[in-house]
Swiss-Prot record:
GO CC, alphabetical: nucleus; protein-containing complex; transcription regulator complex
GO biological process annotation, one example: mesendoderm development
Residues modified to N-acetylmethionine: M1
Location of Phosphoserine modifications: S320, S325, S328, S354, S360
Subcellular localization: Nucleus
Keyword Transcription regulation: yes
One of the Pfam families matching this protein, by short name: SSDP
Region (Disordered): 140-166, 184-361
Function: May be involved in transcription regulation of the alpha 2(I) collagen gene where it binds to the single-stranded polypyrimidine sequences in the promoter region.
InterPro entries for this protein: LisH (IPR006594), SSDP_DNA-bd (IPR008116)
Name of the protein described by the UniProt record: Single-stranded DNA-binding protein 3
Composition skew (Pro residues), residue ranges: 245-255
Compositional bias ranges of the Polar residues kind: 258-269, 346-361
Gene behind the chain: Ssbp3
């Protein structure tokens, strides 16, 4: 109502009350209520001199103008009487200078009825007020406007759907060198792509995203086919990985004796977690004459898919990798494509298998 600034005096509430009391007394005198006017002054203990204005007085004139404009508002002009000047005032004000925030919204509650879109108050609040709303943060290729649900919030470098890797492997798990002691991993580091798909749920949480391409670049079998063997790690974190020497999927990595020089780090650390308070010094899998994986010849059938127990493995006889029981192809030997459609593992109940050759769990 009053312009606030250093050069202009702002009237206090006391001055406003005095003005209003003067206008009320003036109104009562102009309408002929002299006794009411004197009683009013005595009850409010008015002691100053009063100078009356011309009739009908400021209060009456101000009220008439307000009421005319109130009745000429667009939502009431059809039901209330008003002057043409008041109607023209509303029409001109709405067409010439609409409100930048609310526009021509009817003054019900001062706010629109529907939800306010993102960034509604941003263009005119952020430059002036330091505490105004900040623009929404966009990530990646999200379009401006901050409307959720239009684009994924992850940039291209973090979007797993844009990688060539497995869908269950995040974008950050793409290029990792295989650990030492794992034997030959195929022709160099490879990503899962170009036709090579690992079976679903085959990578446990303890071995995320190791780039172990299959031997000789052969494609993985389709996990959706009916003849594929579903081998998933029933014990998380203990899956060894895909075959290293061209063997069928589901067989542990078993390097040939010629590659035993690369086994300075025991592969047992990759397939058997350390039990609480225990040790794993009794596992006979160091580099020797039978190769680093020579003691895995007599594993039980349920241990051949990488789901090893959490305890130590004791007392396994050392066999040559070429004499492994229950595997259709020894590691390093080629196989026919026709094997992909049949059963990869022979029956494990043969002469070379006995209950005494199982792992202690």
């Amino acid at each position: 109502m009053f312009a606030k600034g250093k050069g202009s005096a702002v009237p206090s509430d006391g001055q406003a009350r005095e003005k209003l009391a003067l206008y009320v007394y003036e109104y009562l005198l102009h309408v002929g209520a002299q006794k009411s006017a004197q009683t009013f002054l005595s009850e409010i203990r008015w002691e100053k001199n009063i100078t009356l204005g011309e009739p009908p007085g400021f209060l009456h004139s101000w009220w008439c103008v307000f009421w005319d404009l109130y009745c000429a508002a667009p939502e009431r002009r059809d039901t209330c009487e008003h002057s043409s000047e008041a109607k023209a005032f509303h029409d001109y004000s709405a067409a010439a200078a609409p409100s930048p925030v609310l526009g021509n919204i009817p003054p019900n509650d001062g706010m629109p009825g529907g939800p306010i879109p993102p960034g509604f108050f941003q263009p005119f609040m952020s430059p002036r007020y330091a505490g105004g709303p900040r623009p929404p943060i966009r990530m990646g290729n999200q379009p401006p406007g901050g409307v959720p649900g239009t684009q994924p919030l992850m940039p291209n470098s973090m979007d797993p759907t844009r990688q060539q890797g497995h869908p269950n492997m995040g974008g950050s798990m793409q290029r990792m060198n295989p650990p030492r002691g794992m034997g030959p991993m195929g022709p160099g580091p490879q990503n899962y792509g170009s036709g090579m798909r690992p079976p679903p749920n085959s990578l446990g949480p303890a071995m995320p995203g190791i780039n172990m391409g299959p031997g000789a670049g052969r494609p993985w079998p389709n996990p959706n086919s009916a003849n594929s063997i579903p081998y998933s790690s029933s014990s998380p974190g203990t899956y060894v990985g895909p075959p290293g020497g061209g063997g069928p999927p589901g067989t542990p990595i078993m390097p040939s004796p010629a590659d035993s020089t690369n086994s300075s780090d025991n592969i047992y650390t990759m397939i058997n977690p350390v039990p609480p308070g225990g040790s794993r010094s009794n596992f006979p899998m160091g580099p020797g004459s039978d190769g680093p994986m020579g003691g895995m010849g007599g594993m039980e059938p349920h241990h051949m898919n990488g789901s090893l127990g959490s305890g130590d493995i004791n007392g396994l006889p050392k066999n040559s990798p070429n004499n492994i029981s229950g595997i259709s192809n020894p590691p390093g030997t080629p196989r026919d494509d026709g094997e992909l459609g049949g059963n990869f593992l022979h029956s494990f109940q043969n002469d070379n298998y006995s209950p005494s050759m199982t792992m202690s769990v």
